[in-house]
Amino acid sequence: MILKSGLYIVSTPIGNFEDITLRAISTLKNSDIILCEDTRISQKLLAKHYIHTKLQIYNDHSDYKDREYIISLIKAGNVVSLISDAGTPLISDPGYKLVRDLRNLNYYIEVVPGVSSPITALTLSSLPTDRFLFSGFLPKTIESKKKIFAELVNLKATLIFFDTASRLINTLLLAKEIFGNREICVARELTKIYQETKTGDIDEIIEFYKNNILKGEIVLLISGNVQVQNKQINLEKFIEFCLSKNLSSKTIIELAYDKFKDVYSKKEIYSVVHKKKFTA
């Protein structure tokens, strides 16, 4: 397999070493160098699949000098692969600055897709999957965490976060304070022998985990704002009613905005009115 010089963003397993594509193995074997977060972790995966390519550290501590060196390797015609400790690179992992610099310089960039823990957790959670938002790692401090939750409380999408298991109970107590007793899912040890996903309302999950000592990282999923979803239905019904009374679009928008301004902007209401008016 002959690869074009450039950067290859290669997904790796999140737990089960067999969750790697044939293309990923071939790409890593035919690279001149593999950038990784931790050589000790990546070496185990490479050994499993008989990959002997040289490893080089690229992590959160890497700076512009490291990026310049990597760019010089690609400029010289080398094939460079980027992997993370687990899953898809750049998803709450280092790398986007390197990709941005290479993109600005018009160097070749390719992705070799594969598993990702947020998507794996979402598909197992039984929470709605049609709309979701991944917000990365939750901060350590309560105030910072509260700020993030407050920004997302009205979203209709399923929310996905990374968190540390040791902070889970405190996170859930705060989540209940901000979101109410919503349905959530806690996913851990994904694709491993002791994989576990627990779905229920926040009180149920707190009760389940309050006496269990957890380690490592978890994926926390919080269902979207059902009240907002209900208001969307109510908005559409309200507009349909107004149209049935032959009210003008301007009047309907003003009435709807006064009633639903805590959820929708005038622009969003205009869009719904326009859609309903011309599909009625």
UniProtKB/Swiss-Prot annotation:
Q: What Enzyme Commission number(s) apply to this enzyme?
A: 2.1.1.198
* Entries under Pfam families matching the protein: TP_methylase
Which Gene Ontology molecular-function terms are recorded?
rRNA (cytosine-2'-O-)-methyltransferase activity
The reply on keyword Transmembrane is no
Where found?
A: Cytoplasm
Q: Which domain of life is it from?
A: Bacteria
Q: Record's Gene Ontology CC terms?
A: cytoplasm
Per its UniProt record, what SUPFAM superfamilies does this chain match?
A: Tetrapyrrole methylase (SSF53790)
Q: PROSITE patterns, alphabetically?
A: RSMI
**Catalysed reaction per UniProt?**
cytidine(1402) in 16S rRNA + S-adenosyl-L-methionine = 2'-O-methylcytidine(1402) in 16S rRNA + S-adenosyl-L-homocysteine + H(+)
Write the record's keywords in alphabetical order, separated by commas: Cytoplasm, Methyltransferase, rRNA processing, S-adenosyl-L-methionine, Transferase
Q: What does this protein do?
A: Catalyzes the 2'-O-methylation of the ribose of cytidine 1402 (C1402) in 16S rRNA.
Family note: Belongs to the methyltransferase superfamily. RsmI family.
Protein name stated in the entry: Ribosomal RNA small subunit methyltransferase I
